[in-house]
Amino acid sequence: MKGLFAFGLGLLSLVNALPQAQGGGAAASAKVSGTRFVIDGKTGYFAGTNSYWIGFLTNNRDVDTTLDHIASSGLKILRVWGFNDVNNQPSGNTVWFQRLASSGSQINTGPNGLQRLDYLVRSAETRGIKLIIALVNYWDDFGGMKAYVNAFGGTKESWYTNARAQEQYKRYIQAVVSRYVNSPAIFAWELANEPRCKGCNTNVIFNWATQISDYIRSLDKDHLITLGDEGFGLPGQTTYPYQYGEGTDFVKNLQIKNLDFGTFHMYPGHWGVPTSFGPGWIKDHAAACRAAGKPCLLEEYGYESDRCNVQKGWQQASRELSRDGMSGDLFWQWGDQLSTGQTHNDGFTIYYGSSLATCLVTDHVRAINALPA
């Protein structure tokens, strides 16, 4: 999702130093079986959501309460930001994960750094929630590729081949992956949130994704790996999302050995297409995943009006393909009540306990549970 407003990251409570979250217990890492996901021994279709802000909370009770609500709603997968990049170290106890500078970068493993992610992983472990952790942002929110560009030069388009940027990106990957390599809470490592390379040959992202997924696999033999792209670049239609101008080729990227499943997003309102575009977009990605023998995950989707009627139709379209390429969906985004008030409403937020949550979470989970095994 692009264009997020900065979430209020003021100090909510004192944070105790936390050991690395290393997992344990009976839960197992998520797997794939053909075009279907396997979570804790169950093969099927799974629902989930996104929360870009949860890893930046400094009040442990807020983390726990949010995850309790997600788990009790029947959602199994939660996608979060595993990045928070800055070029200048913030004052006080503001949360940041990595400071990028040409003179030398720093990964923050302190109480206002990766220890916040530690707590999230630990809390997810105890609740059986599986996390997709995105490792960098294409967009400028929370630093992203732009923070690397500020430190090492070039552009976001050249970021994928910028040797110094990629060297530091891999250092950061190693720091994060090594902390949670044994945690059953990790569903997948995600190379980037919505990677694009506008006007580039699609080989740029293809080659980068091949190299980085190989690198992650060298660090972690067990957990799943995915790209995090929006699903742009598909044959058969000429509308904008099907075109290749953003530098991605969905079908080609599915051939990358160490990418275990395909991701795609859906925002008709942002893309200038009608809501009726949705079912076909889902069907075409499912077909591509089926042909590649990998699961498809509708990783982000949202609409800003008539949301119950519009989005439940998309959910139904995805569920109907649960044995034909689709294996899950994650709506954008989860909303909750924290100790500091409601989380940010970007126009797509679905708040816990709302009538919209009944329509798009409770009813959806019930329908998933009724699917044949």
Swiss-Prot record:
It is an enzyme of class 3 (hydrolase). Substrate binds at residues 81, 193-196, 230, 267, 271, 332. One of its GO terms (molecular function) is mannan endo-1,4-beta-mannosidase activity. Not glycosylated. Optimum temperature is 60 degrees Celsius. One of its GO terms (cellular component) is extracellular region. Gene3D superfamilies: Glycosidases. Optimum pH is 4.0. Disulfide bonds join 197-200, 289-296, 308-359. One of its GO terms (biological process) is mannan catabolic process. Changing residue 194 to A: Reduces catalytic activity 100-fold. Its EC number is 3.2.1.78. The active site is at 194 (proton donor/acceptor), 300 (nucleophile). It comes from the Eukaryota. Keywords: Disulfide bond, Glycosidase, Hydrolase, Secreted, Signal. It holds the Pfam family Cellulase. It catalyses: Random hydrolysis of (1->4)-beta-D-mannosidic linkages in mannans, galactomannans and glucomannans. The keyword Hydrolase applies. Belongs to the glycosyl hydrolase 5 (cellulase A) family. Endo-1,4-mannanase that catalyzes the random hydrolysis of (1->4)-beta-D-mannosidic linkages in mannans and heteromannans. It is a crucial enzyme for depolymerization of seed galactomannans and wood galactoglucomannans. Hydrolyzes structurally different mannan polysaccharides, such as galactomannans, glucomannans, and beta-1,4-mannans from different sources, yielding principally mannobiose. Also has transglycosylation activity. Monomer. This is Mannan endo-1,4-beta-mannosidase A.
